[in-house]
From Swiss-Prot:
It comes from Cupriavidus pinatubonensis (strain JMP 134 / LMG 1197). Belongs to the NAD-dependent DNA ligase family. LigA subfamily. The keyword Membrane does not apply. Residues 1-21 are annotated as: Disordered. This is DNA ligase.
Length: 711
C-alpha cells in the first residue's frame, strides 16, 4: 500500500517551512493532486493505496503550507472540507432543471405495464404484439437498471469543473442550499478530473454505509448523544446541520445517477454512457447496474438485486429502470410530475408479528379520525415500531383487528408502519373488538362520517385543538378573511403559547401581545393588528369559506351566499333546503348541517359577530337553472384536449354530480385513452359511455357554458 508517486513517503515527511513561494506553489499543487488521487482511490474505487498515517502526513503538510502561504489557498483544496462557521438557516435554491419524483411499481404486472407503455410510446411493434413480443430481447426497449438508494437526493452544480453549489431536492422545484456541508463530504470531488463542461449539474444520493452508520452510533452512544434509527435518518440529519463542522465529522457518501443542466458539451447518447462519463470525471457511481432489454430483463435485474439486498453495504428500497437512450427519454416525455421513461420498482416492505396492546384514535389537523394500533415494540424495516395505522373504521372491520390480537406489521413503503393482517389462530379469549368513539377525544365535538366517505371527522373545526392551527391559517388566508401577516410561524406561536384558541380570539389581539412574539417587531405587529381590524368588514361568501366547512370551497360558498343572503338562514337550513342551492348535493348538504349542528362552532360564530365581523346581507335569490341536475357522471382515462379537472368543472357547472366510481346509479361515463376498469364496469352495467366530443355535445345541447362562466 505504497504511494505510486516516487518518493512520496520521503516528501511527505519533509518539513514544510522555509520553502520559497515558487517551490511552495509547486509543492502545494502536488500535494493537492496526491490527496485528490487518494480520495478517489478510497471513496470512489474503494481501493486505498496508502495507509491512513501517510495520508494524514500529506494532509498536515498541505495545511501547514497553506497557512504559511495564504495566497495559495483555493476553495477546491482538500483542506477546505473541514467546515466553516455555523449557519443561521439554509438559503433556498430554485432548480434550473426540476428534480422530479418517479412513479412506483410494486409487482411484475406494474413492470410489464411500464415496458408496454414505453414500447407503445416509442412506436415499437413489439408493444402491440402480445406477450411473446413484449419479452423478446431482439425487439424490446433498452433500459438502464440501477439501485434505488435510501438516502437524500442531491443536486451538485459544477462550473468549469469546480463545485459551486449543492442543493437538496426539496419539493422538486426548489431545495435548500447545503453547499458548505456537501463540501465536507470526501466522496464528492470539489474539482472534476480531466476536461470538464462549462456547466454540469449532477443528480445523486447522499447516504451512509451501514458500517459507517454503526460506528457513528457507537460514538454517539459513548458520548451520551442521541443515536440515529437508521442510515437514512443519519445521512439526512448530518447533511442538514447548520454547523458544517458537525457534518464534516459524519461519514457521508455519495452516488451519482442523473443529469440536470449541461452546457459546453453534447449530452451523451445513453444513460449508461452518462454514468460512465461521471466515473471518468471522478464522481462516485455505483457498479451495481446493468443495461437490459424488455420486461424480462428488468425483472431479472430486480430479482438478482433482491437476492443480495441484505449483503449490500448500504440500504436500498428498490431498483430504478430508465429508458437508456436519452433521445427516447425525450420522446416519451413526462406525465404530471414524473417521467414516463422511468419507474422505481420497490421491494416488498419487511414484515414482523407483534401484539396489539390497544387501539386509540388520533385527530389530524383537518379533523380526520384515524384508528392507531398501539403495539408491543417490534423491530421491522430498520426501526423499532410501537404504533401502526389502521387507516379507518372500515379497515379495522375488514381486517378484523381486535385488542389483544397478534398481527403482522409492515412498514408500508418502508416508511409508515401498518397492520397487514391478523393471525387469527393466536387470538386470545379476552380479545376485545374496537368501538369507534362518537365524540372527538380532543374537544368532545360530535364525530361525523359522511355518506360514501371512509374517513370519520371531528365536526368541531373552529374549537378543536388538534385542528386549531390549520383552522386559523384557513380563516386568515387571502381568499377567506385576508389577514395579511398571519402566517405559519405566527399562528404556531399564538397557539403553542395559548394566546389564541379560536378565530374569534384574533380580534382581541393588540400590538403589545404580538410584538412579544419571536421575530415580531412593533411595526410588523402593528401591520398585523391593522390587517385583523380590516378583516372585520368582509363579504358573506368569504366568511362562509373562512369557516372551513368540509366540501365547501370558494364556488360553493358563493352559491350559498347568493341563495341564502343571510347567515341566520344558512345556519338553520336543513338538508332539503340546502339541496335547493345550485351545485350542492347530499354530501355537501350533510356536511353543512353537521357543521352548524355542532354547538361549539355556533358559539365561535357568535363570538365573531360580537367582535364586529360583518358583511352586507341581501335577500335570497332564486336557484339558477341546472340542466344536468340529478345526473351522475364518472370520468376515466385521459381526454384529448381537456384535463379531468376542467371536464369536472363543466359538468358540475351544469348541475351534474361527478363521482369517483361506476355503479348502477351512474348516468354517463366519459372515457378517454387508457380508461381501464371503470370503462369495463360501465359496459357490463350498460351505462352509456361518451367520449370528450360526446360530452361537449351533450353540454351544448342543454345550453351549459364553459368552465368558470358561473363563478
Amino acid at each position: 500500500m505504497n504511494a505510486t508517486h516516487r518518493g512520496a513517503q520521503a516528501d511527505a515527511s519533509a518539513p514544510a517551512g522555509g520553502l520559497p513561494p515558487a517551490t511552495a506553489a509547486e509543492r502545494v499543487q502536488w500535494l493537492r493532486d496526491e490527496l485528490d488521487r487518494h480520495n478517489y482511490q478510497y471513496y470512489v474505487l474503494d481501493a486505498p493505496t496508502i495507509p491512513d498515517a501517510e495520508y494524514d502526513a500529506l494532509f498536515t503538510e498541505l495545511q501547514a503550507l497553506e497557512a504559511e502561504h495564504p495566497e495559495l489557498l483555493t476553495p477546491d483544496s482538500p483542506t477546505q472540507r473541514v467546515g466553516g462557521a455555523p449557519l443561521s438557516a439554509f438559503d433556498t435554491v430554485r432548480h434550473r432543471v426540476p428534480m422530479l419524483s418517479l412513479n412506483n411499481g410494486f409487482s411484475d404486472e406494474d413492470v410489464t405495464g411500464f415496458d408496454r407503455r414505453c414500447a407503445q410510446g416509442l412506436g415499437r411493434s413489439a408493444a402491440a404484439g402480445g406477450e411473446q413480443d413484449l419479452f423478446s430481447a431482439a425487439e424490446g426497449v433498452e433500459y438502464a437498471c440501477e439501485l434505488k438508494f435510501d438516502g437524500l437526493a442531491m443536486s451538485l452544480r459544477y462550473e468549469d469543473g469546480r463545485l459551486v453549489q449543492a442543493a437538496t431536492r426539496g419539493d422538486g422545484e426548489t431545495g435548500e442550499d447545503v453547499t458548505v456541508n456537501v463540501r465536507t463530504i470526501k466522496a464528492i470531488p470539489l474539482k472534476l478530473r480531466g476536461a470538464a463542461p462549462a456547466v454540469l449539474e449532477v443528480r445523486g444520493e447522499v447516504f451512509m454505509y451501514r458500517r459507517d452508520f454503526d460506528k457513528l452510533n457507537a460514538r454517539q452512544a459513548e458520548a451520551g448523544d442521541k443515536t440515529f434509527v437508521n442510515p437514512r435518518n443519519a445521512a439526512a440529519g448530518s447533511l442538514r446541520q447548520l454547523d458544517p463542522r458537525i457534518t464534516a465529522k459524519r461519514p457521508l457518501s455519495f452516488f451519482a445517477y442523473g443529469l440536470g443542466e449541461l452546457q459546453g458539451i453534447e449530452r451523451p447518447a445513453t444513460h449508461s454512457a452518462m454514468l460512465d462519463g461521471f466515473a471518468t470525471m471522478g464522481l462516485p457511481v455505483c457498479n451495481e447496474r446493468a443495461v437490459v432489454k424488455g420486461a424480462q430483463g428488468l425483472l431479472d435485474f430486480y430479482r438478482k438485486v433482491g437476492e443480495k439486498r441484505d449483503q449490500l453495504p448500504y440500504d436500498i428500497d428498490g431498483v430504478v429502470y430508465k429508458v437508456n437512450a436519452l433521445a427516447e427519454q425525450e420522446q416519451l416525455g413526462f406525465v404530471s410530475r414524473a417521467p414516463r421513461f422511468a419507474l422505481a420498482h420497490k421491494f416488498p416492505a419487511q414484515e414482523m408479528t407483534t401484539i396489539v396492546e390497544d387501539i386509540e384514535v388520533q385527530v389530524g389537523r383537518t379533523g380526520a379520525i384515524t384508528p392507531v394500533a398501539r403495539l408491543q415494540p417490534v423491530f421491522v424495516g430498520g426501526v423499532t415500531v410501537t404504533n401502526a395505522t389502521l387507516h379507518n373504521e372500515d379497515e379495522v372491520r375488514r381486517k378484523d383487528v381486535h385488542i389483544g390480537d397478534t398481527v403482522i406489521v409492515r412498514r408500508a413503503g418502508d416508511v409508515i408502519p401498518e397492520v397487514v393482517a391478523v393471525v387469527l389462530e393466536r387470538r386470545p379469549d379476552d380479545a376485545r373488538a374496537f368501538v369507534m368513539p362518537t365524540a372527538c377525544p380532543v374537544c368532545g365535538s360530535h364525530i361525523e362520517r359522511l355518506e360514501d366517505e371512509a374517513i370519520a371527522r371531528c365536526t368541531g373545526g373552529l374549537i378543536c385543538a388538534a385542528q386549531r392551527k390549520q383552522a386559523l391559517l384557513h380563516f386568515a388566508q387571502r381568499r377567506a378573511m385576508d389577514i395579511e401577516g398571519l402566517g405559519d410561524k405566527v399562528v404556531e406561536q399564538l397557539v403553542d403559547q395559548g394566546i389564541v384558541r379560536t378565530p374569534a380570539d384574533l380580534y382581541k389581539l393588540g400590538v403589545a401581545k404580538l410584538a412579544a412574539l419571536d421575530r415580531m417587531a412593533d411595526k410588523s405587529a402593528g401591520n398585523l393588528v391593522a390587517a385583523i381590524e380590516a378583516s372585520r368588514s368582509t363579504t358573506f361568501n368569504r366568511f362562509i369559506f373562512s369557516l372551513g366547512i368540509r366540501h365547501v370551497g370558494e364556488a360553493t360558498a358563493k352559491d350559498l351566499a347568493r341563495h341564502f343572503g343571510k347567515l341566520d338562514g344558512l345556519m338553520v337550513a336543513d338538508e332539503a333546503a340546502l339541496l335547493e342551492v345550485n351545485d350542492v348535493g347530499p354530501v355537501v348538504a350533510q356536511s353543512i348541517v353537521n357543521f352548524f349542528g355542532e354547538p361549539h362552532n355556533v358559539e365561535v360564530i357568535e363570538q365573531l359577530r360580537a367582535a364586529g365581523v360583518h358583511w352586507p346581507e341581501s335577500e335570497p335569490v332564486a336557484r339558477a337553472p341546472a340542466p344536468l341536475a340529478g345526473k351522475t357522471f364518472v370520468l376515466t382515462g385521459t381526454l384529448p384536449s381537456l384535463s379531468r379537472e376542467a371536464a369536472k368543472e363543466m359538468l358540475e357547472a351544469a348541475g351534474a354530480k361527478v363521482a369517483g366510481s361506476v355503479s348502477k346509479k351512474t348516468d354517463y361515463v366519459v372515457a378517454g385513452a387508457e380508461a381501464g376498469s371503470k370503462l369495463d364496469k360501465a359496459e357490463a352495467l350498460g351505462v352509456p359511455v361518451l367520449d370528450e366530443a360526446g360530452m361537449l355535445a351533450l353540454l351544448e345541447s342543454v345550453g351549459a357554458g364553459q368552465p368558470g362562466e358561473q363563478s
